[in-house]
Amino acid sequence: GWLDTYHTFSFAGYYDPRRIHFGALRVLNDDTVAPGEGFGTHPHDNMEIVSIALEGALRHGDSMGNMQELRPGEIQVMSAGTGITHSEMNASDTEPVKFLQIWVLTDAENHTPRYNQIRLAPAKRNELRTIVAPEGRGGENTGWLHQDAWFSTLDLDKGHDVEYRMHTPGNGAYVFVIEGLAEVDGEVLGRRDGMGVWDTDGFGIRA
């Protein structure tokens, strides 16, 4: 088919009552879309949606009049709020597009819909980089959400480690390995593995 997708949490035809959400994190989909294909126009409401391009170009169009292409080094953040329709298509007729689609439960219903596309600040190896933060808490090159949720990326050299600290006491963190191996809080994770961590103020990540 035109779509190769892996779901961390229950979504569409995949349902596991033990894997509905992790805190406010509701969806984490790892999608590969064939050339010239994609998700036609469909509705959303009352959800915060983040797309992170990994490879290729994703063409976004929505009922607010936005039409943009998302490429590696960029993210798009959308608040569905009172309701929007949008489409996501592979912008290439020859190459696949790979991206992560992440849904976060909103802090309140019926926000005004909005869309932002952000060019991320250059990543520094072996340092955490915040790419999404709550409204008013991020910098120039970060997206924001209607939720107490933070997204960070990390590119670690083998043998290096960092300590991740929770931004809010009582929050948990979900770690997803895009490539390579990582040891997270003593557990070894491989490519595309994920793990939730909670009941702690922080934890170590080691390559």
Where are these regions (language model features)?
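Ligand-binding loop in jelly-roll beta-barrel domains
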Residues: 63-67, 80-110, 190, 198-207
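Short histidine-centered beta-strand/loop micro-motifs
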Residues: 37-44, 61-62, 87-91, 142-144, ...
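A short glycine-rich, His/Asp/Glu-containing loop-to-beta-strand
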Residues: 1-43, 47-49, 97-99, 106, ...
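A non-catalytic, helix-rich entry segment at domain boundaries
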Residues: 110-116
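Short, polar/charged, low-complexity connector loops/linkers at domain or secondary-structure junctions
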Residues: 130-139, 144, 183-184, 188-204
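Short acidic (Asp/Glu) patches
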Residues: 32-37, 54-66, 70-74, 79-92
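Glycine- and acidic-residue-biased ligand/ion/polar-headgroup-sensing regions
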Residues: 45-65, 72-75, 158-160, 164-187, ...
